[in-house]
């Protein structure tokens, strides 16, 4: 497998979360700071109370670990919001395919 230019913990988390959500049907959530800026994006599985991101599945309460920002909280985010903040349409087909492969591994 070739080396990736994507970094799912530093900016490309919305791409991976969208791919995981598409595959699993689970909703997308964000870790937001005190000013409601999205610092990290993940998928939330309500049935197990777990978050899924590039680190794998973990208790939802731990999803904020190692995420920078003041007054972090979690809230549901829309695809439209992620498009506006992270520019999901700017990713190439190759990058989407790479994220979908990673998502399949995580789901």
Functional labels for PLM-detected ranges:
Residues 1-107:
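A structural boundary/capping signal
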């Amino acid at each position: 497998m070739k080396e990736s230019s994507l970094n799912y913990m530093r900016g490309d988390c919305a791409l991976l979360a969208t791919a995981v959500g598409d595959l699993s049907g689970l909703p997308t959530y964000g870790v937001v700071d005190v000013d409601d800026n999205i610092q990290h994006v993940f998928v939330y599985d309500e049935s197990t109370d777990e978050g899924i991101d590039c680190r794998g599945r973990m208790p939802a309460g731990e999803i904020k670990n190692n995420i920078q920002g003041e007054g972090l909280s979690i809230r549901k985010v829309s695809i439209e919001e992620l498009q506006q903040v992270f520019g999901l349409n700017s990713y190439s087909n190759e990058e989407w395919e790479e994220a979908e492969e990673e998502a399949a591994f995580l789901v």
